[in-house]
Regions:
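Serine hydrolase/lipase
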Residues: 1-2, 16-142
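Gly/Ala-rich beta-loop-alpha elbow adjacent to hydrolase catalytic centers
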Residues: 3-7, 11
């Protein structure tokens, strides 16, 4: 299963629900927001222990910082694959909750990098016909 942005969150929820009746092999999400609280994260980890799962984040994409964990207690599940640029390169791998990948940047700072949400692995998942998003650096999308 795979998804970008809210589609990534929906892929996680669907995989969790479907895993009762179907075998889920792999889950890859891109720019996914936080999905659940600590109890849900624990339940997901227990149920999906044998599923390959990676949460990919592009540089300072603000969406993975939402909703703010301090506001509602939401957390990420699974390891993070973090690209420190918006193009293909060598990613860093971080365990869930580790702040050395995208977590090193605050939500406020990431809000000035909204273009990073529509630039994954050199592709634009926000608009399939555009190779890269049209942005003004530091101001987000035009």
């Amino acid at each position: 299963m795979s998804g970008h942005s809210l589609g990534g969150a929906m892929a996680l929820l669907a995989a969790f629900q479907l895993s009762d009746k179907y075998r889920i092999k792999e889950i890859y999400t891109f720019g996914q927001p936080r999905v659940g609280n600590d109890a849900w994260v624990s339940a997901f980890a227990a149920r999906m222990a044998n599923v390959t799962f990676f949460r990919v984040v592009s540089y300072m994409d603000p969406v993975p910082h939402l909703p703010p964990s301090w506001l509602m207690g939401y957390r990420h599940v699974g390891p993070e694959v973090w690209y420190d640029t918006t193009t293909q390169g060598s990613p860093a791998f971080c365990a869930a909750g580790q702040d050395s990948c995208s977590g090193q940047y605050s939500l406020f700072r990431c809000l000035f990098h909204t273009c990073d949400h529509c630039s994954y692995l050199g592709l634009n998942p926000c608009k399939a016909n555009d190779p890269q998003p049209a942005c003004v650096q530091g101001l987000g999308q035009r």
